[in-house]
């Protein structure tokens, strides 16, 4: 007997032959990447700009060390965030919480002119939020399809198009606003779009039905064998992704030292 498609009836509605939920994830990820790469585009420039230019006047070496440490932790925390989502939070709750923390983080960076501690608080919130957000939104994409669905590769291609579009727009707009108008405006714009992405996902998540909800013992016992096979395949995919992230972290740490 063919396994019933995951989620609700809404999930079975398609756009360009893909579940409509894919495009909710597409835009959520796009705005998150907008904020991430937009902030990264001006981080070192802000730190190395003179105090007269509203920067901190750091040496480039020191700024790059902070940048490297931040980037390394951004790749490390998804290992923890994926486990928390699997065991406790569920993928959707992890995505919402992670997006909220990142929106707060960008907002805190925008307040660096008031107090320098806001800057470091912002980086910390971004690291934690990314750990919850990044691995779990990708997992939801995989769960929109059966394990053997030929459309899954195309779905990830569409999803990564959102990543590229967000990165391009973030670097362009946040970079321009930060350099030409004010650094805090660049950080603030990143926060605005991250907050927008969070709201979009939060209010549209009903379209996913039961996909990505908080795990329970009851729901685990009631799953069919086909669902178990799908979950196993998804778990294997996540393990491969985490192994890749771990390799990146190791090389990033080696770069720092």
Locate the predicted segments by residue.
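C-terminal ends and interior cores of transmembrane alpha-helices
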Residues: 97-117
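Intracellular juxtamembrane helix-capping segments at the cytosolic ends
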Residues: 132-146
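Short amphipathic helix-loop junctions that connect adjacent transmembrane helices
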Residues: 41-64
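Glycine-rich segments within core transmembrane alpha-helices of 12-TM secondary carriers
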Residues: 74, 151-179, 186-197
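Hydrophobic core of transmembrane alpha-helices in multi-pass small-molecule transporters
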Residues: 105, 116-133
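Central cavity-lining transmembrane alpha-helices of secondary-active solute carriers
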Residues: 64-86, 134, 168
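Intracellular loop-helix junctions on the cytosolic face of multi-pass helical membrane proteins
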Residues: 1-24, 147, 175-257
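Cytoplasmic membrane-interface "Motif A"-like loop-to-helix N-cap segments
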Residues: 87-99, 149
């Amino acid at each position: 007997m063919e396994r019933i498609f995951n989620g609700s009836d809404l999930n079975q509605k398609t756009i360009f032959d893909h579940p409509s939920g894919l495009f909710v994830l597409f835009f959520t990820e796009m705005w998150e990447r907008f904020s991430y790469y937009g902030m990264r585009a001006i981080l070192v420039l802000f730190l190395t700009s003179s105090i007269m230019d509203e920067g901190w006047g750091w040496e480039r070496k020191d700024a790059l060390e902070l940048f490297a440490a931040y980037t390394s932790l951004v790749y490390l925390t998804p290992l923890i965030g994926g486990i928390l989502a699997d065991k406790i939070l569920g993928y959707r709750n992890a995505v919402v919480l992670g997006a909220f923390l990142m929106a707060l983080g960008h907002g805190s960076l925008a307040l660096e002119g008031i107090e320098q501690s806001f800057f470091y608080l912002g980086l910390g919130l971004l690291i934690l939020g990314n750990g919850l957000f990044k691995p779990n939104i990708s997992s939801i994409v995989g769960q929109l399809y059966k394990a053997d669905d030929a459309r899954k590769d195309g779905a990830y291609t569409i999803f990564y198009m959102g990543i590229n579009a967000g990165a391009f727009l973030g670097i362009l707009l946040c970079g321009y606003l930060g350099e030409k108008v004010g650094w805090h405006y660049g950080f603030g714009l990143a926060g605005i779009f991250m907050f927008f992405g969070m709201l979009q996902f939060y209010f549209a998540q009903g379209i996913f039905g039961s996909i990505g909800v908080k795990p329970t013992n009851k729901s685990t016992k009631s799953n069919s064998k086909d669902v178990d096979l799908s979950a196993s395949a998804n778990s294997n995919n996540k393990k491969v992704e985490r192994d890749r992230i771990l390799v990146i972290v190791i090389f990033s740490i080696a770069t720092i030292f």
